[in-house]
Structure formats: structure tokens, C-alpha cells
UniProtKB/Swiss-Prot annotation:
Protein name: Phenylalanine--tRNA ligase alpha subunit
Iron-sulfur listed as a keyword: no
EC id: 6.1.1.20
Residues the entry annotates as binding Mg(2+): E252
Keywords, ordered alphabetically: Aminoacyl-tRNA synthetase, ATP-binding, Cytoplasm, Ligase, Magnesium, Metal-binding, Nucleotide-binding, Protein biosynthesis
Family: Belongs to the class-II aminoacyl-tRNA synthetase family. Phe-tRNA synthetase alpha subunit type 1 subfamily.
MF annotations from Gene Ontology: ATP binding; magnesium ion binding; phenylalanine-tRNA ligase activity; tRNA binding
Compartments (UniProt record): Cytoplasm
A biological-process GO annotation: phenylalanyl-tRNA aminoacylation
Annotated SUPFAM superfamilies: Class II aaRS and biotin synthetases, tRNA-binding arm
Organism annotation: Pseudomonas fluorescens (strain SBW25)
Length: 338
């Protein structure tokens, strides 16, 4: 048994001197494995007298249990040390500044739409929407646009068939609103519209906001005051505004609205072509035929309507000189509007 005590002492010393889990595993195999030294001692029991075997076997089992207990404790200690070292190597310095998440922002067209809608809802207008795939009647006939009008040609309008098309303006929403509601009516109609045109200042798809007010005793002075106040609030400055006589089939009288150039304050520049004025929208008093076809008596009610291109207003407000930049999805451009 002296040899057993010496073997146990040797095993315990080896366990305590192990510097890592792999070395500890080799020690376990060397002493406790199938061919380990303590296992081999157990196999020598067959050489002892029968009366000595139980006592010696018990001593060997106690020795193996002691070595196993110390080995497991050393293994736990080494694993804990390894984990602590790994955590220390991977630790995060919470005092360092974090990486900020890149935040998005509203598209300049969306910002412009919201700005327009905010003004008109503030003065009592509602928001009305309608289908982008429209029928010929609501897009043209109900708006007093005759069959020979150039806007009805395939060069300007995207047709699906003889009767269905992509709306060329949001005016059909006004017609549908008048058909479904009795005056007084106060609405703006924002939305996408489509025309067969594409260059530096035109896009086949663009956004438009049209407005309509129908009530008793509405006159051109009401229209003029509304538009002048809108432009003042939208551009956040006092601007000279003029109304030029024009023609639209759905309004009579009709006018084009020009405002003082926001780039040069009316002095003349490349943007306004040295005129000092910028065209911003069309407007007029709703034509009696349009009211009549919508089921409203033009002898009792009158109204005004106006329409503006959202991209046009956004270009002027933000100083953008190419319409196509709004649709290129270039984050370097869009990031300016956050």
C-alpha cells in the first residue's frame, strides 16, 4: 500500500501542476484511464489472497475517488480561469462613444406634400383621394375637356384602352367629391399623376395638389387671397404675386399664378430667365358646365379651383435645379433634407 500512497501523491502533484485543461486530461488518462496506473493497480487484486482483496480494493477505490475529486476541482478552476481570460480579452469599454445608428428622413417631396396639406387643413380644407387609374369621363368629359383637346392625345396621356387611362391630374377627385357631396365643399387633392413627358423639368410621373372650394357667393377675390396667403406661408416670406389671364377648359375665368423669383428677389436671374417672375400654379373659377355635370346648380353655387406641381414647389423651396434628382434615390442628395 506504500506504493499506492506514493502513486496517489504523484497523481495529485501532477494534477496541481497542470497548466491547462488539455494537460489535465492527459493526466487523467495516465492515472485513471483504461490503461492508467491506478486502474492497473486494481487489476492486481487477483494476485492477492481472497481474504485481503476487499480491504485492498476499498483502499484503491478511495485513492481513485480522491484523485478524481482533486482532478475535477482543478479542471473547474482552470476552466474558470480560461473564461475570465476570454472575457477580459473580449471586454467592451463602455466609456467609449458608441456608434450612432444612421437615421432616415422624409423625402423632400413628402415634406413638401405635408407642408401643403398642413396649410390647407389648418384653414378648414379636407384631404380627398381617388383612383390613379381613371376613366375617360372623370378625367376629361366631366371637366369640360372636349374630344379634340390636345391633352387627350396619346402623345400626352397613357391609355390602357379607349376608356381607361392613368389620370393626368387630380381633378377627377374633385369631380367625384362633388358628385358624392353637397356644397359647401372645401378639399385639396394630393396624389401622383402621369403624363407622357420626360426631361430636366418634367417626369412621366409626378405629384400634384389641386384644391376646390364650392359654396354660395364665392368669387375671384376669395381665390386670390387664398393663393397669396398660401405662397407667403409656404415660402416663409413676403412675395409679390401676379395673376395672368389664361385658359383652362374647367375654369372660367382662368389664370396662371406667378410669384416673385425666390432666387433673386425679382431682380432677374438664370432660374427666372431674367424676368424676375416664376410660374407656380394655375387657377380659376369653376366652370358652370363642370358644376352642372357634377350635379351642382351653378345658379346657386360657385367655386374656385387651383392646381400646383409638388416637385415644382419643392425645387423652388430647396433650390434644386434638376427634377430627376428627386427620383434618383441618391442618399447623398436626400441626406440634405433630414
Amino acid at each position: 500500500m506504500e506504493n499506492l500512497d506514493a502513486l496517489v501523491a504523484q497523481a495529485l502533484e501532477a494534477v496541481q501542476s497542470a497548466e491547462d485543461v488539455n494537460a489535465l486530461e492527459q493526466i487523467r488518462v495516465h492515472y485513471l484511464g483504461k490503461k492508467g496506473e491506478l486502474t492497473q493497480v486494481m487489476k492486481t487484486l487477483g494476485n492477492l489472497p481472497a481474504e485481503e482483496r476487499p480491504q485492498v480494493g476499498a483502499l484503491i477505490n478511495v485513492a481513485k475517488e480522491r484523485v478524481t475529486e482533486v482532478l475535477n476541482a482543478r479542471k473547474a478552476s482552470l476552466e474558470e480561469a480560461d473564461l475570465a481570460a476570454k472575457l477580459a480579452a473580449e471586454s467592451i469599454d463602455v466609456t467609449l462613444p458608441g456608434r450612432g445608428q444612421a437615421s432616415g428622413g422624409l423625402h423632400p417631396i413628402t415634406r413638401t406634400l405635408e407642408r401643403i396639406e398642413q396649410f390647407f387643413t389648418h384653414i378648414g380644407y379636407g384631404i380627398a383621394e381617388g383612383p390613379e387609374v381613371e376613366d375617360d369621363y372623370h378625367n376629361f368629359e366631366a371637366l369640360n375637356i372636349p374630344g379634340h383637346h390636345p391633352a387627350r392625345s396619346m402623345h400626352d396621356t397613357f391609355y390602357f384602352n379607349a376608356n381607361m387611362l392613368l389620370r393626368t391630374h387630380t381633378s377627377p377627385v374633385q369631380v367625384r367629391t362633388m358628385e358624392a357631396n353637397k356644397p359647401p365643399i372645401r378639399i385639396v387633392c394630393p396624389g401622383r399623376v402621369y403624363r407622357s413627358d420626360s426631361d430636366i423639368t418634367h417626369s412621366p410621373m409626378f405629384h400634384q395638389v389641386e384644391g376646390l372650394l364650392v359654396d354660395r357667393d364665392i368669387n375671384f377675390a376669395d381665390l386670390k387671397g387664398t393663393i397669396e396667403e398660401f405662397l407667403r406661408v409656404f415660402f416663409e416670406k413676403e412675395l409679390a404675386v401676379r395673376f395672368r389671364p389664361s385658359f383652362f377648359p374647367f375654369t372660367e375665368p382662368s389664370a396662371e399664378v406667378d410669384m416673385e423669383c425666390v432666387m433673386c428677389s425679382g431682380k432677374g436671374c438664370r432660374v427666372c430667365k431674367q424676368t424676375g417672375w416664376l410660374e407656380v400654379m394655375g387657377c380659376g373659377m369653376v366652370h358652370p358646365n363642370v358644376l352642372r355635370m357634377s350635379g351642382i346648380d351653378p345658379e346657386e353655387f360657385s367655386g374656385f379651383a387651383f392646381g400646383m406641381g409638388v416637385e415644382r414647389l419643392a425645387m423652388l423651396r430647396y433650390g434644386v435645379n434638376d427634377l430627376r434628382l428627386f427620383f434618383d434615390n441618391d442618399l447623398r442628395f436626400l441626406a440634405q433634407f433630414r
